[in-house]
Amino acid sequence: MSRPALNTFISSITLGALALAVPPAQAAEPSAKDIMEKVTVTRKLDGSEAVVKMTVTDDKKQSRERDITMATKLYDGGKTEKRIYRFLSPADVQGTSVLVFDYETKSDDVWIYLPALRKTRRIVSSQKSQSFMGSEFSYGDLNIPAIDDFDYAMSKQEPFGGETCYVIDVTPKSKDVAESEGYSKKTYWVSKDKFTVMRGLFYDKDGKLLKELVTGNIKLLDAKNKRYRPMHMEMINKQNGRRSVFDSSKVTFAPSTKDEYFTTAYLERS
């Protein structure tokens, strides 16, 4: 081998060794807002149907159970999720139904049908902080919040529920959003692997801890698009001692869910 060729060969080996010696740059962590945007995407399914048992426990540890059927479907290229909840039992709530149009960039539309009155009532934005059918969940808690209505900050990473989680503080950008939600701040523990909320803390308008959300039994329902849903959600009111649990069963990924389910006409069917 000639000297120039030998020098080139040695230089190539040296550069290769240096490249191996330098550790690869670690991928930058996503921003807090990016994480919450991913959470929003991850919970959306093209369509789904489920049976839900809602258990409401008061401060004296007395519980009431309600059986619900639920269906969801995406519209407008995924920018709108429509949901319907229909109460099957007990008798005092049988036939009550709730229809939600959950929009990505504007205030949601919510209607509730009360069979005793044979009347459908629209729930306005200022009522979103009200209790969902006597539970510790509000109507707003069950909806997907508009991402641009909030500021986001990641405080740390820590384990929760068997998952390594990002811990993210979420604060409303305006008084109107805060009043509509009923919270001055929320803190979420978000799984780094599944991008689902594992835990949430909700603070009232005075900054005092109001409620804690804990989720579990996370299921992969759409493997192709990596869409997850918690089968268990528990909301604990830290100020009055009440708690409510949603346990989902018979959950199916169903893109062909009927469009007629998501109409006020269907809402009023017995």
Segments the model singles out, each with a brief description of its role:
Residues 99-101, 109-113, 119-123, 128-145, ...:
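Gly/Pro-enriched, hydrophobic low-complexity segments
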Residues 74-81, 156-164, 223-225:
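Short, ordered beta-strand-loop transition motifs
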Residues 22-28:
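Sec/Tat signal peptide C-region and signal peptidase I cleavage site
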Residues 1-13:
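Bacterial N-terminal signal peptides that target proteins for export
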Residues 30-116, 153:
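N-terminal mature ectodomain segment of secretory-pathway/periplasmic proteins
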Residues 269-270:
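Short, solvent-exposed mixed-charge patches
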Residues 146-151:
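Surface-exposed beta-loop interaction hotspot
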Residues 11-21:
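Bacterial N-terminal signal peptides
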